[in-house]
Regions:
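Flexible, solvent-exposed loop/hinge segments and secondary-structure transition points
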Residues: 1-163
Length: 163
């Protein structure tokens, strides 16, 4: 549990984390299949409401996964009420190739997501625009898996929480 809370704090610091408020919305999203269909098969695992000291929601933390090159890539995504990504983290070791897909855990890659909105795409060769993420050279599959999971998280918050 300590590593889970640490991954939450990395993407969205809060006084309290509530994993019960949106459990029904998560079940609905998982069963209707729209989010997976819209985001390259990315799936949602859990959702947590981040709260301040007064109990007011400050954002949402969504844990999801998508198929990477070496296996399932699990990503924790912080999303604020303006549908901006506050950060991402990897709660488990990535099953990706060392020196390639493993570079997703380096700040040069994962810090690109902070402040971005919905419907991001992966751009090869650098020079990513506002709604784009620079792919890791030689690891486009991993880059796409992470981006699809982030997109699934923001779509879930938009369509099932803030609707």
């Amino acid at each position: 549990m300590a590593s889970t809370i640490a991954s939450y704090k990395q993407v969205m610091p809060a006084e309290e984390y509530d994993d019960e408020t949106y459990a029904d919305a998560l079940t609905t999203a998982q069963s209707d299949g729209k989010i997976a269909a819209d985001n390259g098969g990315a799936s949602l695992i859990s959702v947590v409401a981040a709260k301040d000291a007064s109990g007011a929601e400050t954002g949402y933390i969504v844990k999801g996964s998508a198929a990477g090159y070496g296996g399932s890539v699990i990503v924790v995504v912080g999303v604020d009420a303006d549908l901006k990504v506050t950060g991402i983290s990897f709660p488990e070791t990535l099953p990706e190739t060392a020196g390639l897909g493993q570079k997703a855990t380096e700040p040069a890659f994962y810090e690109q997501f902070a402040g971005k909105g919905t419907k991001l795409s992966v751009k090869k060769g650098g020079g990513a625009g506002e709604d784009e993420i620079d792919a890791i050279s030689g690891a486009t599959i991993t880059s796409t898996a992470v981006t699809n999971t982030v997109n699934a998280a923001t779509e879930f918050v938009q369509d099932y929480i803030l609707k």
